[in-house]
Amino acid sequence: MKIKLIDSVVRSFKVAKIFRENTDKINAIDFAPNGEHLISCSEDDQIVIYDCEKGTQSRTVNSKKYGVDLIHFTHANNTAIHSSTKVDDTIRYLSLHDNKYLRYFPGHTKKVISLCISPVEDTFLSGSLDKTLRLWDLRSPNCQGLMHLSGRPIAAYDPEGLIFAAGVNSESIKLYDLRSFDKGPFVTFKLNQEKECDWTGLKFSRDGKTILISTNGSVIRLVDAFHGTPLQTFTGYPNNKGIPIEASFSPDSQFIFSGSTDGRVHIWNADTGNKVSVLNGDHPGPVQCVQFNPKYMMLASACTNMAFWLPTSEEGL
């Protein structure tokens, strides 16, 4: 039985399960494409994997030596990539079932601030404060492509995995064709440069029509993916700590979810720009990560705690 996401259903979300596995803030989360598992990483150097069907924590893996950030499931079962917070700025490919590294991807000389995996194949993109964007293949430790940019780059693949977007210097979005990225971007959208904050994340909507820009301030932007036209600006949530708060789409691209430093989850209608709801969970600290499950009607949000949310209204049935 599929529930349709409408305003009343979104407002009915309540915390169904809270996990207190971490001793420091959770800095990244990622759902497996089939929606069955969620992976998280924290500043306490722990990687925690959750079972979304059972609503349980299934295992914990430590990354004490290198630290862990920007974690993503890869397409193979039980594997993930992540950036490092200690030693160096190498990206690491981890086998989760035996906690062994399968491969290292060295190259970046400063902190990696963006990491995304292709939705269709075993390639991934990384952006760093060294002002480069690198394209990688999981099967090779050598960088497959290198783009030198004029400022801090963040990246995202489109849902088809054919193009990628690079957000540069919090003021422009460049679109590249993956088959000919070495020719440079095929289009560049110039936006007004952020005065108060930096862009910290890009995401395409599932329908590929819009791009969501997250920041380390209290503003989220939505732009047209074909023309770069600004569509919406979402505000009215606090971020007084300058943290990179994640904004996410619902799978139907209709709603935008964001964390905040007030420990709540803020939700807007993507078409109208109107605030739909503010959800109160069991978050004593800033909520940095919020994502909607790609297959199940569930939402995850994280501060130091991890919260799983479920709708309590049947109206959308």
From Swiss-Prot:
One of its GO terms (cellular component) is histone methyltransferase complex. Belongs to the WD repeat SWD2 family. InterPro entries: G-protein_beta_WD-40_rep (IPR020472), Swd2/WDR82 (IPR037867), WD40/YVTN_repeat-like_dom_sf (IPR015943), WD40_repeat_CS (IPR019775), WD40_repeat_dom_sf (IPR036322), WD40_rpt (IPR001680). This is WD repeat-containing protein 82. Component of the SET1 complex, composed at least of the catalytic subunit Set1, wds/WDR5, Wdr82, Rbbp5, ash2, Cfp1/CXXC1, hcf and Dpy-30L1. Interacts with male-specific lethal (MSL) histone acetyltransferase complex at least composed of mof, msl-1, msl-2 and msl-3. Interacts with su(sable). Pfam families: WD40. WD repeats lie at residues 21-60, 107-146, 148-186, 194-233, 238-278, 282-317. Component of the SET1 complex that specifically di- and trimethylates 'Lys-4' of histone H3. Together with su(sable), part of a transcription termination checkpoint that promotes transcription termination of aberrant RNAs and their subsequent degradation by the nuclear exosome. The lineage of its organism: Eukaryota, Metazoa, Ecdysozoa, Arthropoda, Hexapoda. One of its GO terms (molecular function) is chromatin binding. Its main location: nucleus. SMART domains: WD40. It is found in: Nucleus. It comes from Drosophila melanogaster. Keywords: Nucleus, Repeat, Transcription, Transcription regulation, Transcription termination, WD repeat. It comes from the Eukaryota. The keyword Transcription applies. GO terms for biological process: chromatin remodeling; DNA-templated transcription termination; heart development; negative regulation of DNA-templated transcription, elongation; nuclear RNA surveillance.
